[in-house]
């Protein structure tokens, strides 16, 4: 091993984690998992510079000193309390937003005591609240936008993103969004876990269909003002119902023609607002696969001893098999379809690579070949009919 490589090797003790922003070793309780994913999202998705982010930054509240989980500063500003622009609080998933000590009230008190802090976010990995602080006649009140802005402060695309502004999800942040949406359906609409999951899948299909509907403008969005009014929520529901009609036409084997989105307008608008920032088509296959398969496993695992193979083991097994175009692949206990999806994507990439030199004239023929391979080469069985349906969705 060379000296340059050897100098970068660092042993991390059990129970510790190396912080993504400042490289410090920290204890690794459940809330740290949430914070590390948020840190990655700030840098890798939103484009913040690590040097403008401070972890466990001290602030004064009256005569006491508190530490905020994440403080963000404008570019080039010194790291003092008066220059904090965004505060983010990260909690473990058993602390609700309404918690008197560690809930959103804590975040609001931090924002109120920090004069130039405009934005705040509170999350426990299954719930998320975003606030924008407004000062009117010496009174502070908090608006509730869909998300915090990037480092340029531009809020235009928070309400209505364009395809060019959709973010590719990183690490477990898409999984966080799925959990947040599912938890919202479960608690707001009163649905049990499985029905709530299938309602969420309808919305995910609508999101993907909307992204594919080129060159038309995106219709999968909910503005903050729409989310805050009954009429606005109904407007969102009408848009999503329009998209879902196209989904049912394309995927009649999954969604019957009389199927509907059975969510209250308030809940639907919240979920759309949470998912709209991500580009599902440009998010990495492994990120999407892990998010989908974990949310499926958490909600559809029955009492028949199902065990879902970890994704890295799936990846290793497919690499060992090295499937080729023209082969038929069967998984007799397919679960969520993870093995099949990885194999399918590997073969599709092989075909694309073989045809990459042919140019645009053969692009349509190549797409036809890929569609034929995807529809005729992969098969799965499972004892759980709900998992069979989930596998179909995963492969689509």
Spell out what each predicted region is.
Residues 205, 209-297:
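Long recognition/docking surfaces used for binding and targeting
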Residues 307-396:
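Conserved S-adenosyl-L-methionine
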Residues 184-185, 287-312, 318-323:
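Class I SAM-dependent transferase core
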Residues 1-119, 127-163:
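A short, conserved, highly charged catalytic patch centered on acidic carboxylates
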Residues 29-33, 186-201, 262, 281-284:
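Structural motif
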Residues 37, 195, 199-203, 270, ...:
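Amphipathic alpha-helical interaction segments
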């Amino acid at each position: 091993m060379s000296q340059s490589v050897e100098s970068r090797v660092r042993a991390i003790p059990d129970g510790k984690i190396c912080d993504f922003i400042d490289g410090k070793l920290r204890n690794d309780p459940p809330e740290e998992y949430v914070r590390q994913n948020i840190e990655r999202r700030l840098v890798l998705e939103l484009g913040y510079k690590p040097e403008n982010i401070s972890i466990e930054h001290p602030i004064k509240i009256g005569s006491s000193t508190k530490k905020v989980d994440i403080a963000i500063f404008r570019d080039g500003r010194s790291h003092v309390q008066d220059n904090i622009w965004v505060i983010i609080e990260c909690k473990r998933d058993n602390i609700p937003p309404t918690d008197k000590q560690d809930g959103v009230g804590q975040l609001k008190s931090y924002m109120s005591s920090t004069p130039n802090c405009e934005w705040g976010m509170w999350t426990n990995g299954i719930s998320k609240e975003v606030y924008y602080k407004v000062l009117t006649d010496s009174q502070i009140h908090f608006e509730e936008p869909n998300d915090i802005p990037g480092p340029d402060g531009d809020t235009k695309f928070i309400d209505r993103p364009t395809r060019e502004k959709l973010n590719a999800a990183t690490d477990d942040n898409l999984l966080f969004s799925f959990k947040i949406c599912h938890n919202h359906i479960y608690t707001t609409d009163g649905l049990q876990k499985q029905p709530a999951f299938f309602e969420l899948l309808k919305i995910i299909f609508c999101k993907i269909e909307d992204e594919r509907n080129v060159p038309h403008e995106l219709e999968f969005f909910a503005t903050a003002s729409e989310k805050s009014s009954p009429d606005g929520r109904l407007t969102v529901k009408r848009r999503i119902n329009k998209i879902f009609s196209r989904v049912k036409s394309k995927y009649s084997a999954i969604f019957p023609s009389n199927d509907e989105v059975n969510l209250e307008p308030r809940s639907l608008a919240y979920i759309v607002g949470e998912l709209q920032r991500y580009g599902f088509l440009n998010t990495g296959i492994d990120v999407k696969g892990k998010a989908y398969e974990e949310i499926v496993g958490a909600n559809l695992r029955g009492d028949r001893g199902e065990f879902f193979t970890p994704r890295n083991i799936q990846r290793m097994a497919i690499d060992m098999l090295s499937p080729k175009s023209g082969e038929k692949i069967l998984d007799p206990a397919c679960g969520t379809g993870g093995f099949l999806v990885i194999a399918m994507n590997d073969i599709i990439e092989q075909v694309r690579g073989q045809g990459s030199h042919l140019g645009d004239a053969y692009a349509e023929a190549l797409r036809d070949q890929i569609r034929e391979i995807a529809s005729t080469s992969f098969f799965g069985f499972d004892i759980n009919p709900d998992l069979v349906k989930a596998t179909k969705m995963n492969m689509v």
